[in-house]
Amino acid sequence: KAVREKHPEITVVGTVGPFYEGTDYAEGWRLATEMGVPMVDEHYYVDPGWMIHNQDYYDRYDRTKSKVYLGEYAAHLPGRPNNIETALAEALYLTSVERNADVVEMTSYAPLLAKEGHTQWNPDLIYFNNTEVKPTVGYYTQQMYGQNAGTQYITSHITLSNGQEAVRKRVGVSVVKDEATGDHIVKLVNLLPVEVSSTVKLKGIDLQNPSAVKTLLTGDPKDKQARSVTSAFVDIGGTEFPYTLPAYSFTVIRIHENKGK
């Protein structure tokens, strides 16, 4: 209360412990609710399966309580590699986080930096030595989200020819608008070992003479060297267009209106 009165520009952030459940989590949230803490810092390091099966995690949150800063998170596999499997699990989960941006106001992968030969924790996002900087595969997931965050979420749905829950949970979509540029941004994640054919339908949106660029991150699940590649997206013709999601991939399609051209 004193901080809010003296420095209203400062947001007080509480903590709810290092896990997504348990005593610290429950008591932290109880205290935050009791004290009216504006925002809480959540941490969790989980296996990719947790991220696949908990895409409704923030759907269930009470909108009247504290906002969330997801301050530490990552997908962990045995041996702690940072590879296509972990990077795509994080990309898939972030589609649901983006959908719940009214609750989750900020996120940050952790840890961020580590010097080779002097690490206490793996995986980290960016490794370096005295002469090189070595971004991981997961870095490119973060970069693709960071450069295409948007400011307005647009409700979207994806329909698959195979309706099995196991299939549905491994394909994610998020659509946002960047109000500063007017660009519409479509994010598509495919954690399946096969291609997925889709038709993107941006209902209720009027695009004038659109053009688009596509950024794609894909590879074998164990690939630790994959990098995102950006290219022109030639199939854009309006608010409805086909797109085939490659197996094990994260795609960002950024659509720009060329008004007056």
PLM feature spans:
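Composition- and surface-driven signal marking solvent-exposed, interaction-prone regions
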Residues: N54-Q55, N82-A87, W121-N122, I126-F128, ...
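Generic recognition of flexible, low-complexity loop/linker segments
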Residues: K1-A2, A26-W29, D56-D59, Y93-V97, ...
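Conserved, mostly hydrophobic/aromatic
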Residues: V40, T107, Q142, V186, ...
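Active-site proximal loops enriched in glycine and acidic residues that flank catalytic Cys/His/Asp
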Residues: G14-V16, Y44, E72, S108-P111, ...
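Aromatic/acidic polysaccharide-binding cleft in carbohydrate-active enzymes
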Residues: K65-V173
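Active-site neighborhood of glycoside hydrolase catalytic domains
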Residues: K1-P81, A87-A89, Y93-L94
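C-terminal beta-sandwich/jelly-roll accessory domains of carbohydrate-active enzymes
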Residues: S161-R168, V189-K261
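C-terminal catalytic subdomain
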Residues: V133-K134, Y145, E179-L192
